[in-house]
Design a protein with these regions (language model features):
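Conserved active-site and cofactor/substrate-binding residues in soluble primary-metabolism enzymes
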Residues: 97, 101, 139, 223, ...
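Conserved C-terminal alpha-helix-loop-beta "cap" of PLP-dependent enzymes
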Residues: 43-44, 49-50, 158, 173, ...
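N-terminal entrance/gating region of PLP-dependent enzymes' catalytic architecture
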Residues: 1-128, 482-488, 492, 505
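Secondary-structure capping and boundary motifs in well-ordered enzyme cores
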Residues: 98, 102, 133-140, 164, ...
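Glycine- and acidic
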Residues: 86-95, 120-133, 156-160, 201-214, ...
Length: 516
């Protein structure tokens, strides 16, 4: 069989059971009052190691790179230190066992990729400020909401209003509640009942683009820019400051919101309603645009590099893939012809595209948007300008190690390969449909590195760590429920894993029992 030939998938083969590793028992790790002997302790750790190793080899359903072996070999020595990047990353602080110098190198790397300009200088409003997150992008999104809430709030003025699409990560709904940020749904329902400019009731989130059905369940997962512009216009006209979140690699469909296209629609709205100061200087804007790039902010810059110079990188993303514009370099001319930068903040997860063994991430904004840190700097010896107090000092080391191992050319190759594998999986699922006579509903948003399809048996979902989502093909009708799963083509996924998954699907009892 040649390297490019897919294995033959059996047609309507008798259903075969799938071996599933049972999760470890809690009793295996119970800690008695007297502790454990070395033998007992090591046996327990060996059991966990074996379980995680097996699961790592089959993980394809989540945005989590498992390509981590190199860092483990070189960085184990740092486990001897209690490393804590306490406080602001641009000041060493009183706790000296820290890796802030490495953290700043990582921030500088992403500042270059995201066109954020110069390293932090409090006297330079156009310099960037940021830090490495101890959580994933959820923390970065919360920090953006917190910063934006305080930046946009004016005494005696209408309260800021947040907008995010129905494909936004579920943590956003939690974050607005925790931080007391009002959504357009909440304000519209309470203050402007019956006035939704889209007609009908105020939607809970900004609608996403519809698909062939006319509904969003089979759409690409990107925000409906027309609907967003209409909603923002309504609240801007009422004097409300505006917070907008865009997604770059949405949670289930991997979609990229059209940040540039949306900004082209929103900038005139901001100007019409006085949310963009005419004079410049220190006067605050009345809007904040944030990009949740948990996944996509890690690879989108390399798509653009390849698109801009295909000869240098030996590849260019096709028109369907595109090269999203989403970062601090996105500028548009205002009504007087002056360029206006639109993006105020970006969040990215480090454990997703790059690959770190635990949740972490990067938050970045500009010095001109910062507000004073609220707590006592004298205790920690540095401004407490970050969301967390103690911050993981190992994450900068691991992310730095990854970035130092991979050139820009290497990073372009990683995203090229993921795009290629996404196309391969989508094609093979269509072929499997034809071979089995079963509708698998394979779908891929253009440019996404995820493919979604019919939910198989619970055993297969567990074996391959598949993430699931239920949709109603007719909104409000529970009889039209469909169950989907998806596969993310992360750098640790290869064709052999996909072929093994396809083989399992061809023998799965739930799939085979589906009427043809």
């Amino acid at each position: 069989m040649s390297p490019t030939t897919a294995p033959v998938v059996p047609v309507r083969t008798a259903a075969a059971p799938v071996h599933i590793d049972a999760e470890p028992e809690s009793g295996d790790f119970a800690i008695p009052a007297e502790g454990l002997t070395d033998g007992e302790r090591l046996r327990a750790l060996d059991r966990m190691d074996g379980y995680l190793t097996r699961k790592r080899r089959h993980l394809v359903g989540y945005q989590a790179t498992q390509e981590l072996a190199g860092s483990a070999l070189d960085l184990a020595r740092f486990m001897l230190s209690n490393i804590n990047n306490l406080g602001d990353p641009f000041q060493s602080g009183g706790y000296k066992p820290n890796t802030k110098i490495v953290e700043r190198a990582v921030l500088d790397y992403y500042a270059r990729l995201w066109h954020a300009g110069r390293s932090y200088d409090p006297a330079d409003p156009e310099s960037y400020w940021g830090y490495m997150l101890s959580m994933g992008s959820t923390e970065g999104n919360m920090y953006a909401l917190w910063n934006a809430r305080d930046y946009l709030t004016r005494p005696g003025a209408p309260r800021p209003v947040a907008f995010y699409s129905e494909d936004t990560h579920y943590s956003f709904a939690k974050a607005v509640r925790v931080l007391g940020v009002d959504t357009f749904h909440a304000v519209g329902t309470a203050d402007y009942p019956g006035e939704c400019p889209l007609g009908g009731d105020w939607p809970a989130e900004v609608p996403s683009l519809p698909g062939p059905s006319g509904h969003s369940w089979d759409g690409p997962g990107a925000v409906d820019v027309d609907a967003l512009a209409v909603l923002v216009e309504f609240f801007a006209a009422k004097g409300h400051p505006i917070f907008v979140n865009f997604n770059l690699g949405s949670t289930f469909k991997g979609a990229h919101d059209d940040v540039r296209g949306a900004c082209e629609r929103l900038l005139p709205v901001f100007e019409r309603h006085g949310l963009l100061p005419a004079g410049g200087g220190d006067e605050r804007r009345g809007f904040w645009i944030h990009v949740d790039g948990a996944l996509g902010a890690g690879y989108a810059p390399f798509l653009r590099m390849a698109a801009d110079d295909p000869a240098a990188y030996g590849w260019a993303p096709g028109p369907a893939t595109g090269a999203p514009e989403f970062d601090f370099g996105l500028t548009l001319p205002n009504r007087t012809g002056e360029d206006v930068d639109l993006v105020a903040s970006i969040a990215m997860s480090g454990h997703k595209w790059a690959g770190v063994p635990w949740p972490c991430g990067v938050f970045m904004t500009k010095a001109k948007y910062q507000l004073e840190p609220p707590t006592r700097p004298e205790y920690i010896g540095a401004p407490d300008s970050t969301f967390a107090g103690s911050r993981n000092g190992f994450s900068p080391l691991v992310l730095w190690d990854h970035l130092s191992r991979h050139s820009y050319r290497d990073q372009v190759e990683r995203i090229r390969r993921s795009q290629e594998l996404a196309g391969y999986l989508e094609r093979r699922l269509h072929e499997l449909e034809a071979e089995t006579g079963v509708e698998l509903w394979p779908a891929r948003t253009p440019g996404a590195i995820t493919v979604r399809f019919r939910k198989p048996s619970a055993d297969l979902v567990a074996k391959w760590s598949l993430s699931c989502e239920n949709v109603l093909t007719t909104p409000g009708d529970p009889t039209t429920l469909r169950g989907y799963v998806h596969v993310f083509l992360m750098p640790s996924v290869d064709r052999a894993k996909l072929d093994a998954l396809l083989s399992d699907l061809a023998r799965d009892p739930v799939i085979l029992a589906t009427p043809a």
